[in-house]
Design a protein with these regions (language model features):
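Helix-to-loop junction immediately C-terminal to a conserved catalytic motif
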Residues: 67
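Conserved ABC ATPase "signature" region
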Residues: 83, 131-149
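Short coil-to-helix segment of the ABC ATPase nucleotide-binding domain corresponding to the Q-loop/switch region
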Residues: 112-120
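Conserved ABC ATPase signature
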Residues: 154-158, 162
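A short, proline-enriched helix->beta-strand linker immediately N-terminal to the Walker B motif
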Residues: 173-177
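Catalytic Walker B motif of ABC-type/P-loop ATPase nucleotide-binding domains
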Residues: 179-182
């Protein structure tokens, strides 16, 4: 697999596309500290949207509010036609089945083999599958990330980059409609980071996902973004294409894209 050469697919003008996530005037504070201040954004069908910002800008809080790992203080979050804030526990569980979440840590179960890690969400979410169908889905997901040979390994036997790729395989094995990536390349060497970025693009192409990518890694931005939103101090600072960001004369933007 030559992962480093995979680019994000071309997306038509977003205004003509369906919104799969719509956020309006979102606020979230912890005590007196406002983390998100009137954040509004849209994720369109089939695109890779990168949310960029320095540490502490509210990026990870935003993504946790989307899947109700955190409750927002005010504003609205609409995901796949559902008002997230109004959903009861059963509704949230059903919505999360349609969303893949790649955690920064990878979050594999250390006591399970790679195969068992991938089987777990399938048995929980797609309960009518036969063992043969489960096996086929597991193999397909591992082939997509180039790690079929790790099928029977334990997480402790994997490198950091391999763990991240297995975590991605576990996320896509249930065929999510939306992918949420929380700092997917953090802690990885440049070569492995490029491979992960390329895999994000392959997931976009092969699984027809809409992806929201939280990062402060500029190379990840360059490799994956169809569109970029920059957060600064909990607010949307700029929205645009990679070209618009790289050509901006704004000093804060230039400090990221130097």
């Amino acid at each position: 697999m030559d992962a480093t050469k995979t680019a994000p697919i071309e997306i038509a003008k977003t205004k003509s596309l369906k919104q799969v996530i719509e956020i309006n005037n979102l606020k979230k504070a912890f005590g007196q500290q406002e983390v998100l201040k009137n954040v509004s954004l849209q994720l369109y069908d089939g695109e890779n949207l990168v949310v960029l910002g320095k540490s502490g800008s509210g990026k990870s809080v935003l993504i946790k509010c989307i899947v109700r790992l955190l409750n927002s203080d005010s504003g609205t979050i609409n995901v796949l036609g559902e008002d997230v804030s109004s959903l009861k526990n059963d509704g949230i569980s059903e919505l999360r089945k349609k969303i893949g979440f790649l955690f920064q840590s990878g979050a594999l179960y250390d006591s399970m083999t790679v195969k068992q890690n991938l089987e777990f969400p399938l048995k929980r979410i797609q309960k009518n599958l036969s063992q043969k169908e489960i096996n086929e889905k597991v193999i397909d997901a591992l082939e997509h990330v180039g790690l079929l040979n790790a099928l029977n390994k334990m997480p402790s036997q994997l490198s950091g980059g391999m763990r991240k790729r297995i975590s991605l395989a576990r996320t896509i094995v249930v065929d999510p409609m939306i992918m949420l990536y929380d700092e997917p390349t953090t802690g990885l060497d440049p070569v492995t980071s490029d491979e992960i970025s390329s895999l994000i693009n392959e997931v976009q192409k092969n699984y027809k996902t809409s992806s929201l990518i939280i990062t402060h890694d500029i190379e990840c931005v360059r490799n994956t973004a169809n569109r970029i939103i920059m957060l600064n101090d909990g607010e949307v600072y700029m929205e645009g294409s990679l070209e618009e960001f790289e050509n901006s004369n704004d000093q804060l933007i230039k400090s990221f894209f130097k």
